[in-house]
Structure formats: C-alpha cells, structure tokens
From Swiss-Prot:
Gene Ontology terms describing biological process: pantothenate biosynthetic process
Subcellular location: Cytoplasm
The species this protein was found in: Helicobacter hepaticus (strain ATCC 51449 / 3B1)
PANTHER family per record: 3-METHYL-2-OXOBUTANOATE HYDROXYMETHYLTRANSFERASE
Enzymatic reactions: 3-methyl-2-oxobutanoate + (6R)-5,10-methylene-5,6,7,8-tetrahydrofolate + H2O = 2-dehydropantoate + (6S)-5,6,7,8-tetrahydrofolate
Cofactor: binding details: Binds 1 Mg(2+) ion per subunit.
Stated name of the protein: 3-methyl-2-oxobutanoate hydroxymethyltransferase
Length: 264
C-alpha cells in the first residue's frame, strides 16, 4: 500500500529492483479501490471495449478520455495516473501539443500515453520539450489494429525485435519516462527492457519487463467472452455479481427486503 503519491522519480528508481504494478480504471469508484494498491493506474482507451462494449478502441474521443480521467483522478490520490491520448488526437506535433495541453489543463493526470511508431518521434519530442510527461506505447498497438489487419504479435524475429529496440531507445532519448510494451515475444520484451535506462511496463510482453499491467475487467473476471493468453484471472467477478444481483432480486420479490432496520 502506497503511503504517498507515486512519482516518476520513484517509478524510474524501481527499474531492476522492484517490479512496477499497474491496472486500468475508468471511474472514481474503481480508482478508489485500486488506489495505493498498485503503483500506476491507466485510464486506457480500452474503456471503449471493456466499458463501452465495442470491439476496438478507435472510437474513444478527447471528451470521453478527459471525462473518465477526471473521474479516476478524483478517486485515486496515491497511484500514478496515466491517461491514453485517443486515436487521431496526435496525428501531427501541433495537434498533439494542443490536445495534450487540453488534457493537462482539464485533468490531474500525471502523464499521457501515446501509441507510437518511430514516425511519431517528432510528436513525442514536442510534448517532452513542453514538459509533458509521456509514456510511449510500442509493439502491438490497438489503435492500429485496422492497419495491421487485427491484433498481431510483434517482435517475432530479429528484424522486428531490433526495430522495436531502436524505436524504444529513440523515444528514451526524446525524453519519455517509460515504455509500455504490448503483445511482443518474451525475448523481445526482455531485450527492449535491457536496452533502456527507463522502466518498461508489459502487457503480454513477458516477465522480464520492469512492470506489468492488465485491464481490470480481464484480471477480475468481468469479461469472459474472450481471454487473451497473457491474462490471468484473479477472481470470477462476473459470477460474484451475478449471485449478488440474483439474491437482491429474490429478496425484493419475497419482501425479505427491506425490513424494519432498513426502513425509516
């Protein structure tokens, strides 16, 4: 349990010493539950899938991301809060800076995460030069799933692995404080992590990353239509809530609820 606000300096100091823990959240309620139990809370555009029922993340808007980030910031006072910049909000350096400043002015997010390839290096540089804390997201990038033809594992061979390493190093030199690595072969995840002085957080990128993150509804069994290989379920949350709602409905129908102690 964190007893004070997590910082970039503390996250960087954990590299090679203690694994970084991270989870997603999209509202104040879940943020309060997770706050201080993990180092990082990510307000991911994955909310369009796990929260909005869609099959991709591309529909997330700036307005939605700001709304959910504000909610999470109200609920979490100790964990480090990172917000995703949605698809289309950082196509050019000027657009990226305008939208990043909008995030910073309208939320209490500690940092922003961008899904980027090496072509977006100018975007990353502009944000870092303006004092905006940036995490670069490399490997499998859900915002580009249409371009890639689906969710495809990266870093499968030496060429892909080396390209990811070179991109990660370039982003480090541009000023990012960390790298999120998604959906890459474990060996590539390890090589990227070893090549960097800044921490890496993995999701489906192997145990050698400096930290791990999962989508909360995957980790706690609220989404069971599909389970990626990298997900471990820590409880069957869907079944727990199903039992609870059925018990509630049964009590209402049988007039077992409310009773005298629950009435004015």
């Amino acid at each position: 349990m964190l007893d004070k606000k997590m910082s970039i300096a503390t996250l960087k100091a954990k590299k090679g010493i203690e694994k970084i823990t991270a989870i997603t959240a999209y509202d104040a309620l879940m943020a309060r539950i997770f706050d201080g139990e993990v180092d990082v809370i990510l307000v991911g555009d994955s909310l369009k899938m796990s929260f909005g029922g869609e099959n991709e993340t591309l529909g997330a808007s700036m307005q939605e991301m700001i709304y959910h980030t504000k909610a999470v910031c109200k609920g979490a006072k100790h964990s480090f809060i990172i917000a995703d910049m949605p698809f289309g909000s950082y196509a050019t350096p000027n657009m990226a800076l305008k939208n990043a400043l909008r995030f910073y002015k309208n939320t209490a997010a500690d940092a922003l995460k961008l899904e980027v390839g090496i072509d977006k290096l100018p975007v990353v540089k502009v944000l870092c030069e303006e004092g905006i804390a940036v995490m670069a997201h490399i490997g499998l990038k859900p915002q580009f799933m249409r371009f890639d033809g689906g969710f495809k594992i990266k870093g499968k061979d030496e060429v892909e692995s080396q390209e990811l390493i070179e991109a990660a190093v370039a982003f480090q030199e541009a000023g990012v404080f960390g790298i999120l690595i998604e959906g890459v072969k474990s060996e590539s995840g390890a090589r990227i992590t070893q090549a960097l002085e800044i921490p890496t957080i993995g999701i489906g990128a192997g145990v050698e990353c400096d930290g791990q993150i999962l989508v909360w509804s995957d980790a706690f069994g609220f989404f069971d239509e599909f389970k990626p290989k990298f997900v471990r379920r820590y409880c069957d949350g869907k079944a727990i809530l199903k039992d609870a709602i059925r018990a509630y409905a049964k009590d209402v129908k049988s007039q077992a609820f409310p009773q005298a102690q629950e009435s004015y």
